[in-house]
Design a protein with these regions (language model features):
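Membrane-anchoring alpha-helices and their flanking helix-loop junctions
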Residues: 1-161, 168-176
Length: 176
């Protein structure tokens, strides 16, 4: 992905990695560990749902291969000599590391705990409420922001409606 970002001169090509990689890696981990227990499939479904929501949100805002995230443009302008290092380490390597570390608990679970024959029903219910609740909060926040940005009267303004009224980043709250 980093090489494609260099070829297209666009570090934003790396952005969908956050959501697309787990959609591919988690099913591979499930297959690799052979942990086809109910709760493992449920965890897979939650990850896929979360990743699908994030990917759709990215696709909605994606303009074309020439569109570069303004933060990357600003970073390159402020630190032109450090840019190659910032690009590979900060924009490409760090997200790869974060996704890898974020998926380690799933690998550990699929490798060990998922072989249990019984499921703690309270744990399942709590996981379902937290997992689905987070995805719902993120989806609602994404929809509210999309609606806000579509209104030409809101150019340059900060969204202070809906979930955004109570939190600067409600979609991140859903992540937690």
């Amino acid at each position: 992905v980093y090489l494609f970002s260099l070829i297209f001169r666009n570090p934003s090509i790396y952005d969908p990695y956050w959501s697309v990689a787990p959609m591919v890696i988690v099913p591979f981990i499930l297959w690799h560990t052979g942990s086809y227990q109910f709760f493992s499939i449920f965890v897979l479904a939650l990850v896929e749902l979360w990743a699908l929501r994030l990917t759709i949100n990215w696709l909605i805002s994606f303009k074309n291969l020439n569109s570069i995230d303004w933060r990357y443009v600003q970073l390159k302008e402020k630190h032109p000599k450090l840019w190659p290092l910032l690009n590979i380490l900060g924009i490409c390597y760090l997200p790869t590391l974060v996704v890898f570390l974020g998926l380690m608990p799933i690998f550990a679970y699929f490798s060990t705990f998922a072989t249990a024959t019984s499921i703690n029903i309270l744990g399942f219910i709590l996981s379902a409420v937290i997992g689905l609740g987070g995805v719902i909060i993120e989806g609602v926040a994404d929809g509210q922001m999309l609606k806000f940005k579509k209104d030409p009267n809101n150019v340059g303004k900060i969204n202070q409606t809906g979930l955004w009224k109570n939190s600067r980043h409600p979609n991140y709250f859903g992540e937690i």
